[in-house]
Amino acid sequence: MNSHSHQTVRAETSRRDFLARSAAAFSGTLLCGGIGRAGEPLGYRIELTTAREGFDRKTGKACWAQSRAGIIPPGVPGNPGDRPLCLITTQPLLLSGSDVYTCVHEMRSDDLGRTWTPPKRCPTLARRIVSDDVEVALCDFTPTWHAATGRLLGTGQTAWYLNNRLMPNRTRETGYSVRDPQTGEWSPWKTLELPDVPRFKSAGAGCTQRVDLANGEILLPVYFKPVKDRCYSATVLRCRFDGQELLYVEHGDELKHDVPRGFCEPSLTRFDDRFFLTIRNDVTGHVTSGPDGLHFEKPRPWTFDDGTDLGSYNTQQHWVTHSDGLYLVYTRRDVRYDHIFRHRAPLWIARVDPQRLCVIRSTERVIVPQRGTRLGNFGVAQVGPTETWVVTTEWMQPAGVERYGSANRIYVAKIHWNRPNRPA
């Protein structure tokens, strides 16, 4: 796998220049996102960039997958500069099987994603050998800044392998790791201790978006089930984090749906003092909201504002949250893309009506285009007041997807807002 960029080049502009550029970058097309509180239409411009690319099926046994950004703000330990330090975590996916992951890697950019270092292996986030034929990996990793402790905390889940294949009737734990601000190294990954009850024997935070509260507590969505059951349920954990250890305090409503595999990969956000949860399901994605991030209304299927089905199924959706507008990033059915596995490309973005809990069809746009393969495992990160990123990877399964132009690109879709995103 060849890096798209082999060196990180330090830009000469300052953080002030970055903010000015973001605010003035609207000579391109503005996409209407609703009327903000000050009466000015909220808009944004999409800048699609590539952090790395390159794939050769003849020699490649793996492709990069599960790429997500983590942002360390300026002027904090580990980033004394005047611009955000941007990271991408990603990990090799073996093409010989299904969801067979190895060690998490890290890429860095100190020039706001103009250039990136090649993926570097993080030994502390590697697989662990349990026995001669059993190994366990940390996967589905999402790094997110925890302001109260000044640490980048990554959360995900474990995957257990028997002879390098997913183990049947396996457990699933919520895994996490903390990046040391002085050394830049990730701590050896740990698992979150949950109540010792059967339904939490398979409980993970893979691919989920969390919310950090002002007091430093964390609302972490997970999905769970007894090991031998078929259907998952979703809930939100309230956790404490001291900069090193993540501790369970309580969990909220247990949301259930008896449709194949139930509710998976929930993602949480907060907008206008209310919490919103989007949830994966095999048949159709669901959405709900609640007052405190723990208790929710009955989830309902995602629809457009005209009442028709959104068509997002069997993969994750994530939130893009601006203080003046709530957006959803998702995949959905479209006859133009029947050649793509589970219609997991392109990635769409649209504004959400937070009262009606629906997607406003007229605001829908493609944020990452399709090139014949899936993009459905992705993440969202706020880079600064006027910039938000959506990061995803071209997943090089099944064989032959490259004939449509896919090349295992790690995309960074930069959303440039025309108005600053105010802190919650």
Where are these regions (language model features)?
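Short, intrinsically disordered, low-complexity segments enriched in Ser/Thr and Pro
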Residues: 378-388
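Conserved beta-strand position repeated once per blade in WD40 beta-propeller domains
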Residues: 66-68, 140-142, 207-209, 265-267, ...
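N-terminal twin-arginine translocation
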Residues: 11-20, 26-39
